[in-house]
């Protein structure tokens, strides 16, 4: 299990390699999707922190506060003083698969995905924790899967 900041930093590095920039909102969604797919495919959480239901979808509060200085703009630097996920670790192919699936969407499109009928965000009270069990069940029932990532991270 990693901190959400560690996973966000990995996504920042992946985005830079692909010539893309990420906002706080987009990072929140990528971390959430990675966590959800990890729960569904590997049966274990990716991040240590709880995910909460906020206005624009699932949010990891500590990650939000670490990046809020960027507002809706581009996150230009990695979050300091957090451990890295080594690029040769089993987690990196998994994170790359999540990025390849969701990284090209706009923040608004990612919010729309998290707000779809039956999504965990809709099934809890605002500003409350979204239980990992609810997230896992939702991602297990999605028709699409992350190709080639079922064994990643094992």
Regions found by a protein language model. Give the residues of each.
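Domain-edge interaction signal
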Residues: 1-154
């Amino acid at each position: 299990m990693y901190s959400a900041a560690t996973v966000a930093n990995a996504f920042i590095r992946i985005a830079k390699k692909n010539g893309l920039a990420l906002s706080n909102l987009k990072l929140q969604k990528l971390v959430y999707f990675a966590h959800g797919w990890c729960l569904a495919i590997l049966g274990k959480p990716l991040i240590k922190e709880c995910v909460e239901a906020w206005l624009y979808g699932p949010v990891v509060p500590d990650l939000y506060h670490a990046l809020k200085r960027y507002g809706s703009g581009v996150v230009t630097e990695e979050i300091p003083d957090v451990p890295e996920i080594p690029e040769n670790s089993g987690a990196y192919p998994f994170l790359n698969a999540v990025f390849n699936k969701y990284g090209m969407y706009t923040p608004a499109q990612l919010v729309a995905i998290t707000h779809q009928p039956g999504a965990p965000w809709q099934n809890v009270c605002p500003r409350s924790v979204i239980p990992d069990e609810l997230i896992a069940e939702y991602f297990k029932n999605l028709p699409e899967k992350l190709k080639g990532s079922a064994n990643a991270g094992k």
